[in-house]
Amino acid sequence: MSEKIDQIVEDLKTLTLLEASELVTKIEETFGVDASAAASGGVVMAAAPAVVEEVEEKTEFNLMLDEVPADKKIAVLKVVRSLTGLGLKEAKELVESAPKQIQEGLGKDAAEEAKKQIEAAGGKASLT
């Protein structure tokens, strides 16, 4: 590069954002160009070879009982029994051993609904 170009580049490096914006506006007015069209064209050309990765949506979920406050244990126990079909003793053991997986392989809607039921009863649940 010529010394003149090098000096211009060094001067541009010292500009603030406001000064750079004013410079772009002045160049657009002086030379009758549109910098936004050139910038977007460059972005499109640079982005063209990028490979688009497909994001696979999860279809099966596991329902985890994360936490049960002591004062909400009975309400959560009832919900766990209705969701799992467990007997009283088994459901009680499951609730008391939180965090614990309650159900696995649920569809998205069923998992969300079960999570809402546990949370409505006062427990904390998550989907994995």
From Swiss-Prot:
GO cellular component terms attached to this protein's record: chloroplast; cytosolic large ribosomal subunit
* Matching Gene3D superfamilies: 3.30.1390.10, Single helix bin
Q: Does the keyword Nuclease apply?
A: no
Q: Name one Pfam family in it.
A: Ribosomal_L12_N
Query: Where mainly found?
Result: plastid
Enumerate the subcellular locations listed in this protein's record, separating them with semicolons.
Plastid, Chloroplast
Query: Matching InterPro entries, A to Z?
Result: Ribosomal_bL12, Ribosomal_bL12_C, Ribosomal_bL12_C/ClpS-like, Ribosomal_bL12_oligo, Ribosomal_bL12_oligo_N_sf
Q: Could you give the subunit structure recorded for this chain? A: Homodimer. Part of the ribosomal stalk of the 50S ribosomal subunit. Forms a multimeric L10(L12)X complex, where L10 forms an elongated spine to which 2 to 4 L12 dimers bind in a sequential fashion. Binds GTP-bound translation factors.
Family label: Belongs to the bacterial ribosomal protein bL12 family.
* Protein name in the entry: Large ribosomal subunit protein bL12c
Gene encoding it?
A: rpl12
